[in-house]
């Protein structure tokens, strides 16, 4: 098992090296041929999202933006691209090392004119490299700064780490917090499972409630804590468990416009990273709740929608990820009632209500029980 994972890692490193060299060679050849260097990238805007019938996710369309040395700004962007490409090849891939996105920003202090002015600039450049190579930043050994999310449930895995191989049962071998998902889940192999569903949960409070109430055991459920807007590794492992193991996925969030976008990022991909949708999105994922109709049906405690909430809901009515009749009805209902609710509002009905009444009823309604 360890050799299998190690071989995959070697293959990924070779592919990343090849793609980065191709990019560097393209820019070099433009200089050689006395052509003003330039690169083209998909426009990362909502208006450039297109639905892929092949993969059932939203991806970037045909609109492009150009980075060209015809302008001073474009020339600096290309300079920084070449410095970053060289660094990733020589320092990361050649030496089997990695850096966080924050570290890359500080590393650039030694690049003189190619130094990044702020971290947002270096983050965007890594996204550019993903688009240009059609690879994920994990292939370049780039790590996020934040900790990974956690999961808890009846699944056994093998994880290859820098210190060797680990065999882990995500119920029996972990503490109350669950198994911490690593930033690169390609280093994980699934060994066995008894799961009948995956419940991806927005808040830590609801994740802990389902664990304490034994929902994972009662329904053979893998519980995944999304920690708000989910990290890429969290979305990727959900997709892998769904596609490779055939485990259905339900997403359980708060009942507000920002939480609906959390669901959309799991199911269809985020606008900012639509180039990775086919790699990370799980189009089979279903929205469990909290629905605006649940607020009405269960008479949950609520907060009034803010102007920001209202504007976000109206924006979602034109978001291609929410174009179904179901979403238009739910969003319009929420605008009509002017209310939002948190997952923990179910506690007002008793600590067991969410696991004994709401979830079983809703999962049956969704055809998952």
From Swiss-Prot:
SUPFAM superfamilies according to UniProt: DNA topoisomerase IV, alpha subunit
The record's annotation in InterPro entries points to: Spo11/TopoVI_A, Spo11/TopoVI_A_N, Spo11/TopoVI_A_sf, Topo_VI_alpha, TopoVI_A, TOPRIM_Topo6A/Spo11, WH-like_DNA-bd_sf
Q: Which reaction does it catalyse?
A: ATP-dependent breakage, passage and rejoining of double-stranded DNA
Active-site residue list: 106 (o-(5'-phospho-dna)-tyrosine intermediate)
- What EC number is given for this enzyme? 5.6.2.2
Keyword Cytoplasm among UniProt keywords: no
- GO terms assigned for molecular function: ATP binding; DNA binding; DNA topoisomerase type II (double strand cut, ATP-hydrolyzing) activity; magnesium ion binding
Pfam families tied to this protein: TOP6A-Spo11_Toprim (PF21180), Topo_VI_alpha (PF20768), TP6A_N (PF04406)
Binding-site positions, Mg(2+):
202, 254
Which key words are in the record?
ATP-binding, DNA-binding, Isomerase, Magnesium, Metal-binding, Nucleotide-binding, Topoisomerase
One cellular component GO annotation, for this chain's record? chromosome
Q: Which domain of life is it from?
A: Archaea
Q: Which cofactor does it need?
A: Mg(2+)
Topo IIA-type catalytic domain: residues covered:
11-149
Described purpose of this protein according to its UniProt entry = Relaxes both positive and negative superturns and exhibits a strong decatenase activity.
Q: Which family does it belong to?
A: Belongs to the TOP6A family.
* Quaternary structure note: Homodimer. Heterotetramer of two Top6A and two Top6B chains.
Q: What is this protein called?
A: Type 2 DNA topoisomerase 6 subunit A
Q: Which organism is it from?
A: Methanosarcina barkeri (strain Fusaro / DSM 804)
Quote the gene name from the UniProt entry: top6A
């Amino acid at each position: 098992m360890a050799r299998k994972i190690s071989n995959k890692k070697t293959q990924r490193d070779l592919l990343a090296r090849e793609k980065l060299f191709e990019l560097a060679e393209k820019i070099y050849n433009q200089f050689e041929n006395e052509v003003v260097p330039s690169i083209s990238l998909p426009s990362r805007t909502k208006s450039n999202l297109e639905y892929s019938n092949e993969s059932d996710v939203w991806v970037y369309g045909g609109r492009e933006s150009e980075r060209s040395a015809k302008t001073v700004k474009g020339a600096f962007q290309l300079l920084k691209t070449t410095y970053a490409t060289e660094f990733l090849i020589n320092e990361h891939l050649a030496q089997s090392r990695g850096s966080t996105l924050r570290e890359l920003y500080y590393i650039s202090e030694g690049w003189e004119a190619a130094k990044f002015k702020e971290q947002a600039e270096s983050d965007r450049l890594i996204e550019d490299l993903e688009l240009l190579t059609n690879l994920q930043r994990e292939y370049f050994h780039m790590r996020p700064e934040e900790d990974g999310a956690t999961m808890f449930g009846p699944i056994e895995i093998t994880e290859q780490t820098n210190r060797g191989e680990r065999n882990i049962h995500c119920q029996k071998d972990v503490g109350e917090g669950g198994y911490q998902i690593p930033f690169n889940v390609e280093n994980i192999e699934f060994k066995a499972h008894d799961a009948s569903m995956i419940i991806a949960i927005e808040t830590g409070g609801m994740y802990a409630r389902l664990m304490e109430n034994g929902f994972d055991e009662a329904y053979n459920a893998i519980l995944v804590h999304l920690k708000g807007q989910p990290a890429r590794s969290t979305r990727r492992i959900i997709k892998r468990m769904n596609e490779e193991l055939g485990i259905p996925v339900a997403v359980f969030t708060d009942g507000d416009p920002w939480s609906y976008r959390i669901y959309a990022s799991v199911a269809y991909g985020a606008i900012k990273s639509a180039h990775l949708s086919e790699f990370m999105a799980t189009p089979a994922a279903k929205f469990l709740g909290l629905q605006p109709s649940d607020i009405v049906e269960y008479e949950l405690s609520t907060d009034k929608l803010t102007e920001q909430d209202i504007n976000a809901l109206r924006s979602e009515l034109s978001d291609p990820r929410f174009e179904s009749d179901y979403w238009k009805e739910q969003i319009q209902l929420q605008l009509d009632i002017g209310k939002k609710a948190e997952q923990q509002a179910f506690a007002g009905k008793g600590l067991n209500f969410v696991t004994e009444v709401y979830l079983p009823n809703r999962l049956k309604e969704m055809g998952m029980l």
